[in-house]
Amino acid sequence: LSEKTQGPSDIKGVSLVPLLREVSETSLEYRFLEVGIDSATSVANFILHGPSDAPPSDPEKLHELGADFWPLALVRALDDAILHLRTNRSDIGNWVIRVTGNGSLIREYDEFLLLHSSDWLSREIRLYWIRVLKRLDVTSRSLMALIEGGDGFSGTLFELALACDRIYMLDDNDSSAISLSAMNFGTLPMANGLSRLQTRFLGDDSRIIELHKIKGKLLSAQVADSLGLVTEIPDEIDWDEEVRLAIEERSSFSGDALTGLEANLRFAGPETIETKIFGRLSAWQNWIFQRPNAVGPKGSLPLYGTGQRVQFDKMRV
């Protein structure tokens, strides 16, 4: 297998040292990621932090940084947090994602990885991001992005928002902004082989061309809404109430019904071997149809038409 890979055969690897993290019942903490866990509301609040320094000047500097290189450090932490919550906290059905940081710096890191895409480590980091974003796509949790100040949701980190079921952006006179980079146009494909923008605007190639022309530009809430890049843009007066209602609404539904609904909506477009296995099929055939919520004595099918209230188990797969 190694003989078929690109690049020299005498490369020197980097050490993926154990992640520095603090784990408790209510939080996960990493260098560039914090996750607060609220069992009462069934919410995990993700806060991802952008870089504080500019990217290295060349691939040699990248190799020297190794696991401390911001995109690699962040994606390792995100991967770990996703797996931890999926495995150990099936009671937490809502994941809310926020980002802080300098959007310009984030786009510079995107440009660095693409400029040096022939370097093996740069390529592996991009492939790592592809895998982790796909892992988020197939996670049976309700995903919501909150853009409430700053321009941290830029380039690669805007892919996190595009992976979410809903994107709420605060309409606050341009202090909140998003921006696109080349990473958003096919470099980080989904399981269906399309970019998340292509999946969002399925069949509307003209919209993708339009968005490509404005990559790198800061887009306000009003502009993002007009382009279809966000779900809702509440103002400061309505923000807290709209977000609270959206989360409470998701929490009130059957977790299994949401797993099916969200899988259906996330995997539009071409059916591939990957989506057949990990998209709708896993959600419906391997989970929903066998669960007590559907076929148990207090489930929706036996009680259909009886007038009795269904008792849903809110645990997620």
Predicted regions and their residues:
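C-terminal alpha-helix plus adjacent terminal tail
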Residues: 1-160, 167-173, 212-226, 237, ...
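CoA-thioester-processing core
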Residues: 154-211
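Helix-capping/helix-break motifs at membrane-protein junctions
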Residues: 202, 235-236
